[in-house]
Structure formats: C-alpha cells, structure tokens
Amino acid sequence: QRQMCIRDSHVNLHVDKGEFVFVVGSSGSGKSTLIKLLMKELDCTSGQLIVSGERLEKMKHRRVAKYRRKLGVVFQDFRLLKDRNVYENVAFAQRVIGRSTKVIRKRVPEVLQEVGLAEKYKSFPDELSGGEQQRVALARALVNRPDILLADEPTGNLDPKTSEEIMKLLEQINEKGTTVLVVTHNKEIVNAMKKRVLTMHDGVIVSDEKE
C-alpha cells in the first residue's frame, strides 16, 4: 500500500506503507524542505504530493490540523516543554487533539514503556541526558499512533552510542508497522542499518538505493 507519493519535474518519489527510508545529502540539498512539505509547513508549488491518501497540494487550511495527526515528528533539538515533566510533555500531544484524561492515563505510560522511560515520567527535561530527551520526543511523536514518523536529524546532538540506541528504537517502531522517514548527515548509521537511501542535491533526488 502506497503511503507517500511526490511527483513534479524535479522529484518522483514513492514510499510504501511500513517502509524505512533515509534521506541524505549536503546542507541546502532540500532534505529539511522535504520534511516541511510533508508536514504542510510549506506549500507544494507544483506537481502532486499525496500522503496517506491526502492530496497536500490541494488541501484546505482547515484540514491541515487533522492531517498532521497522521504524522509523528522528531527534531534534532527535541523541542520539549522545559516547565513540564516527561509525562506532561507526552500527554500534551494528546490534550491538544482533545483526548480524554482516561485515554491519556492509559496511553502515556504505554508509550513511555515503549521508549524505555517508564521510570523517568516525573523528571523534567533539564534532568535528562540528550538521549533521554530524544526518547521523550519520540514518545510524544508516537503517542497518537501516527501512520508516518518523520525524524529530522534525530541523532544530530547525540554521541555515537546514544545515536545507535535511538536508531534501534526507530527500527523497532518501524517493525510494528509505522512508516519511518529519517533525514540525517550520519553516514555511519546509514551504512550500518542497510535501509533504503534517498540522496538529494539542489532539491532533486539524485539516487534511490534500496537494500
């Protein structure tokens, strides 16, 4: 089942449901622009962009918030709420879409267990290591059970060992059926994981290597 399709004069990309895809390329190659297009932070100015059956280039503004519920997004800088503990950071993603307290109390501990942070639910971001903060960000991205997880340089601020742990976690998430798209500069991780790799240059996908 096709999850993502981009067609224009520069890019022709198809991603199937349940795939794990790396996007690599030098700074300014268009990797982060691709993430912003998929998040509907930027508008598609030409061609077609279809994600989970939604035509993004034709999407009305009022539809965007509902579409974004299908996505989980993780960033290099974690983007956690500094004045909220781990539990509250993750619960926040459910509150903004109107989930009940009962649902939140059941789901948040589940996802914290999934990312290995069940014991840290009362900790605040500044009490956590970089790797732990990224796990919180992952839990927040996963708590609403997204179809697609977008990770923009998720290991950019982490040491090699912690980076490897985060990538293993992303792989486990993918094995449960979530489509995962990872933008990265980290060649070691890309080479080690042997997944599909898209290489971008000047906004164009110049190679698409499938393992």
For the regions a language model picked out, list residue spans one by one:
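Conserved ABC transporter NBD signature motif
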Residues: 47-55
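Short coil-to-helix segment of the ABC ATPase nucleotide-binding domain corresponding to the Q-loop/switch region
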Residues: 84-91
